[in-house]
Amino acid sequence: KPDNGTRQQYYGWVLLFDPAFIQGTDISRRMDSYHYFEYNANEALFLTEEEKEVLNRVMATLRNELANHGGEESSDNIVRDMILLVLDYCSRFYARQFKDVAKGDADILTRFQQVLDDYYAQKLQRQNGVPSVKYCASELFLSPNYFGDVIRQCLGQSPKDYIQQYVTARAKNLLLSWKNI
């Protein structure tokens, strides 16, 4: 929402934990697979009511575990498993969100194509080479990870692969027309 000077009140919960708590565990080994930690704020996860209920139940169970058994050795493993459960649910819910984007928003693909067309129309390849995923994402005001995940969901391939195919097709067309690349 734009800032109109009125005070907003938000509610919810935040899951915070010391990195040492997960060091050497399955969670620490899987952290790189959770791309959503690198998304911009405008690429937030939008939960359905059912998804909110699922996460709230998990968090209630986690709070109960900490309140009643916190400090017990067996509790640490249960808490780690609950953290992993929250992370995996978030991955699932992002996958659903990407499917929704793919169904209802072909606009991102059109805009991606336009970014590539404009890049070559402006002859930026002469200075910068092949456009990068980071460049395309920034032109669309998206983080590279979010952009990559959306394109992967929409096209079944990475943005890098799509860019390579675009460049290859463009080069073939220029070679067939005897023009300079």
Regions found by a protein language model. Name each.
Residues 1-38:
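N-terminal regulatory/effector-sensing and dimerization cores
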Residues 36-85, 89, 93:
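Amphipathic alpha-helical segments enriched in hydrophobic/aromatic residues interleaved with Lys/Arg
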Residues 56-67, 113-120, 172-176:
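Regular secondary-structure segments
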Residues 70-77, 92-134, 153-161:
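Short, Lys/Arg-enriched, Trp-marked, Pro/Gly-tolerant hinge/linker segments that flank
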Residues 139:
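Residues within the alpha-helical elements of helix-turn-helix
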Residues 153-181:
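Terminal helix-turn-helix DNA-binding modules in bacterial transcription factors
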